[in-house]
């Protein structure tokens, strides 16, 4: 295997990521290997390791593409409406995205780095960027000085919505309810935000003293 190089390093990186993404979309993470990527792009397996640190690095960059695609979709939904309307649109877009890209989205939670390996800062920034979308939608419910409470509320909402979408994409939602995922998400958002607006949630609690954590993608 192998061919004379006709691509720039950046083009070759994109070829590798395109091939890896296609493999994951069809076969899932279990089907991904350096050998299969190399076969598809018609380069030697060693070429992959010249472009990326290892296969985990390749996977992280595919995950980054997924996060960027979701962020691009969410970024168009914050222009109009009140907090409940905006958060509901974000949540419904999240649900739709997971159903449209089930294997790519599951990749974010199936892929584990070796013990003791931290997520790179550039990856953490992409996660924070997604959380910032939810925080922006919640902003009208939190006065100045409640930024950490707003961060916490965004993560509570994300965890709840993600739970519903996970059951839905796994076809397990019917085990606990006959309601649709879309209806459950709307109820979750409306109920939680009504509590915040009435002073029964994070907006009324004492200011948080510790930094609110980013929801973990890697367990």
What are these regions (language model features)?
Residues 108-117, 173-175:
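Short linear capping/connector segments at secondary-structure termini
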Residues 117-142, 151-155, 183-194:
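Amphipathic alpha-helical packing segments from all-alpha helical-bundle domains
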């Amino acid at each position: 295997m192998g061919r004379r190089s006709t691509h720039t390093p950046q083009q070759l990186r994109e070829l590798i990521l395109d091939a890896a993404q296609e493999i994951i979309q069809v076969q899932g993470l279990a089907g991904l290997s350096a050998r299969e990527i190399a076969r598809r792009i018609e380069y030697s397996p060693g070429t992959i390791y010249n472009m990326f640190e290892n296969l985990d690095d390749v996977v992280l960059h595919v995950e980054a593409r997924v996060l960027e695609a979701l962020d691009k979709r969410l970024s168009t939904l914050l222009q109009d409406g009140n907090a409940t309307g905006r958060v509901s649109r974000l949540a419904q877009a999240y649900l739709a995205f997971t159903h449209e890209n089930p294997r790519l989205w599951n990749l974010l939670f199936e892929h584990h780095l070796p013990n003791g390996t931290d997520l790179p800062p550039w990856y953490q920034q992409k996660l924070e960027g997604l959380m910032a979308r939810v925080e922006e939608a919640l902003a009208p419910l939190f006065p100045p000085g409640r930024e950490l409470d707003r961060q916490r509320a965004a993560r509570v909402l994300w965890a709840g919505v993600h739970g519903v979408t996970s059951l839905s994409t796994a076809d397990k939602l019917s085990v606990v309810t006959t309601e649709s995922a879309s209806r459950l998400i709307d109820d979750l958002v409306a109920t939680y935000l009504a509590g915040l607006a009435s002073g029964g949630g994070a907006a009324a609690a004492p200011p948080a003293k510790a930094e609110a954590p980013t929801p973990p993608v890697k367990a």
